[in-house]
Amino acid sequence: MRLLLILVLLTPVIVAFSVDEELNNADGANAASFTADQEVRHKRNLFPAIARRGLDVELKSDGCPKYCPPGISCCFGDNCATSATSGKMECLKNPRQFV
């Protein structure tokens, strides 16, 4: 009986989230299909803890941080190195090519 009551109470919440997700995809994209940009954002969930803390972080097109000042880590596979063009510490895929 309790299980049925819990199910009945949770159904409106589940439906509300489903409708909200469809409204967010009102630009013509099907809710089941990801664009390439959405797929990248979906896969990058190693980094968003910093973004959730409210730090102003500039992101690259792949969703990883562009610069690596103290307190900001690069995504997996990136390394923090000084860029030859800007002179700033940047998260780079292959930093040896910029040194």
Swiss-Prot record:
The keyword Lipoprotein does not apply. The keyword Cell wall biogenesis/degradation does not apply. Contains 3 disulfide bonds. Residues 1-21 form the signal peptide. GO terms for molecular function: toxin activity. GO terms for cellular component: extracellular region. Residues 22-53 form a propeptide. Keywords: Cleavage on pair of basic residues, Disulfide bond, Secreted, Signal, Toxin. Expressed by the venom duct. Its main location: secreted. It is found in: Secreted. The cysteine framework is VI/VII (C-C-CC-C-C). Has the PXY motif between the first and the second Cys residues. This is Teretoxin Tsu6.4.
